[in-house]
Amino acid sequence: MSTLRLLISDSYDPWFNLAVEECIFRQMPATQRVLFLWRNADTVVIGRAQNPWKECNTRRMEEDNVRLARRSSGGGAVFHDLGNTCFTFMAGKPEYDKTISTSIVLNALNALGVSAEASGRNDLVVKTAEGDRKVSGSAYRETKDRGFHHGTLLLNADLSRLANYLNPDKKKLAAKGITSVRSRVTNLTELLPGITHEQVCEAITEAFFAHYGERVEAEIISPDKTPDLPNFAETFARQSSWEWNFGQAPAFSHLLDERFTWGGVELHFDVEKGHITRAQVFTDSLNPAPLEALAGRLQGCLYRADMLQQECEALLVDFPEQEKELRELSAWMAGAVR
């Protein structure tokens, strides 16, 4: 029986693809070597320990229907669209070796006519007249008996959108998380006009087979045709949840301030695991009582626009005469944290 396994996803859903990756990684025999090829539609993928409010322009993502997906590996934030090809190599130890998977991808690029080289710990670069340009970034995860290396190849990604979603709003965030380094990147289509996802997948597959000296049939998977993966439904539910994608953010603080016709407002939030652990409100309003009450209500609240609005509007029962002020405050807060 072959020790190789090849899976190719027909789904563009990042939560589906990352859930498949997680299930296979947890359940594969330690003797198996797996290649999983996939791609995502319009998604910002962040590292396991990153803060989405710090890394991403979450407001623009919401406006443009761009998803957020937190992966289980470390590293920085990246934007995925259908101009990217994603790969995951998995193996049990001691077989797992990220230098092997890196060489497989480099051999695949070479077979396509692109001379690339590894740079640093995570990147593949090509040399251009303007200097080195990144065409691939990677991240890694290891447990006691297995490991995986996953990464992205830029084929024809919309690099302007990449900059849009990875340059955050100028929010006053004093975060304990790490801000990603924005790398100089280029698309493979600049070097190989017309190159397709299918061609890249075929080249990586052939390099994978050549390295191990055997071949297997590809398993084509999609939400309608999932492989036999115990606990997949639970893994997908977690991968697609707000609690995982946003709530796992490192602790951070957020300062909001605005001047309204009825007075200035300054809000200080401390946020842990997506919940407000402390809220302070400062104002020169002639009637500060609703704002003081709001500070109490926001303690323990999810750091989410709709939940902040809900808590603010709940104060209308106790402060009906301040309806105009509370609705202005509600709309402003919701816009500021998106």
From Swiss-Prot:
What GO terms in the biological process aspect are recorded for it? protein modification process
Q: Which GO terms describe its molecular function?
A: ATP binding; lipoate-protein ligase activity; lipoyltransferase activity
Where is this gene product found?
Cytoplasm
Q: Which UniProt keywords apply?
A: ATP-binding, Cytoplasm, Ligase, Nucleotide-binding
Q: Does the keyword Isomerase apply?
A: no
Q: Name one Pfam family in it.
A: Lip_prot_lig_C
Indicate which residues the UniProt annotation says bind ATP.
R71, G76, A77, V78, F79, K134
Q: Enumerate the transmembrane spans.
A: none
E.C. number: 6.3.1.20
- Which reactions appear under catalytic activity for this entry? L-lysyl-[lipoyl-carrier protein] + (R)-lipoate + ATP = N(6)-[(R)-lipoyl]-L-lysyl-[lipoyl-carrier protein] + AMP + diphosphate + H(+)
Q: Could you name the Gene Ontology cellular component terms for this entry?
A: cytosol
Binding-site residues for (R)-lipoate, renumbered to this chain: K134
Which class of enzymes does this protein belong to?
ligase
Record CDD domains: BPL_LplA_LipB
Domain BPL/LPL catalytic, which positions? 29-216
Q: Where is the signal peptide?
A: none
Pathway(s) the chain acts in: Protein modification; protein lipoylation via exogenous pathway; protein N(6)-(lipoyl)lysine from lipoate: step 1/2; Protein modification; protein lipoylation via exogenous pathway; protein N(6)-(lipoyl)lysine from lipoate: step 2/2
Tell me, what does this protein do in biology?
Catalyzes both the ATP-dependent activation of exogenously supplied lipoate to lipoyl-AMP and the transfer of the activated lipoyl onto the lipoyl domains of lipoate-dependent enzymes.
The miscellaneous annotation reads: In the transfer reaction, the free carboxyl group of lipoic acid is attached via an amide linkage to the epsilon-amino group of a specific lysine residue of lipoyl domains of lipoate-dependent enzymes.
Family statement drawn from the similarity comment of this UniProt entry: Belongs to the LplA family.
**What quaternary structure, including any partners, is listed in this protein's UniProt entry?**
Monomer.
> What's the protein here called?
Lipoate-protein ligase A
Q: What organism does the UniProt record list as the source? A: Escherichia fergusonii (strain ATCC 35469 / DSM 13698 / CCUG 18766 / IAM 14443 / JCM 21226 / LMG 7866 / NBRC 102419 / NCTC 12128 / CDC 0568-73)
